[in-house]
Amino acid sequence: MNSYKGVIFDFNGTLFFDNPKHVLAWGKISEEIRHHGISEEELHEHFNGVPNNKIIEYLFEGQCTDEQKQKYSLLKEQYYREFCKEDKETFHLVAGATEFFDKLKNNNIPFTIASASIKPNIDFFVESFHLDHWINPDDIVYDDGTYENKIMMFKKAAHILGLEVSDCLIIEDSLSGIENAYKAGCRNIIVIDSANKREECPPVHESCVSAPCGYGFFLLSHA
C-alpha cells in the first residue's frame, strides 16, 4: 500500500454490480415512452455510458421538454432502486469490499467515492450498505449537476482527501472512467473488469496484481 496515499472508488460496476438493474429500469421507461423495450444494439449504441437526459432525448426522438427529461430521469432512478431492492440475492457490495475498507482504515489511508450517480441513489447506497461506517457521506462526490465531467469529480475527490490525484489509486470499471482518471492525473488505476472488456482498455503497461477484495481486477500503470 506504499505506492499511493489515498484511494478513490467508482461505485456502480466497481463496488456494486448493478448493470442489469439499469437495463431493466430503462426498459420500463422505454415501454412508457415508446410502448416497446430496448434492443441489444440500442443498449450499446445509445444507453451505455450516456447521461440520462441524452437517453431520454433519444427515446423521445429529440422531441421532449426539460420537464420531461427531469421527470423520466428521476423515474428511471426510482425504478432502478426498486429493482435493486427486489433482487436480494445480488443486492450487496462485491465480495471483499468491506474487508478492503477495513484494511485501508487500519493503514490510515484515506478513501472516498466519486460516482456519476445522483444524490437520491447515493443516499440509497449509504443507507443500504452502511457506507457511513467507513466514509463520511459528505465526502462522497456525486453528480450534482456542477461537474463538467468525471475528470473534475476525481480532482474534487482527491481534494477532499487532502491529496493530489497523482497520489491516489483510482478504482474504475468503465473505459470512459479509466480515460478520465488518467486525464485527471492519476497513474495508478485498478480496473474492475465487470463488463469483460479488458481487451478494449487503453494501450498502457498492464501488471497483474493479487486482488485485495476477492474479485478480479488488473492494474494499469502509466510510465
Q: PLM features: residue spans?
A:
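Short acidic-hydrophobic, aromatic-tinged amphipathic segments that line or gate anion-handling sites
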Residues: 141, 207-219
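Acidic, Mg2+-coordinating phosphoryl-transfer loop and its flanking beta/alpha structural elements
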Residues: 170-208
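N-terminal helical cap/lid subdomain that shapes the substrate entry/recognition surface
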Residues: 2-95, 107
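Short amphipathic alpha-helical segments and helix-helix/interface helices
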Residues: 98-102, 178
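Conserved Rossmann-like nucleotide-cofactor binding loop
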Residues: 14, 21, 119-120, 176, ...
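Helix N-cap/beta->alpha junction signal
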Residues: 19, 95, 115-118, 174
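Substrate-recognition "cap/lid" segment bordering the active-site pocket of phosphatases
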Residues: 90, 112, 118-169, 175, ...
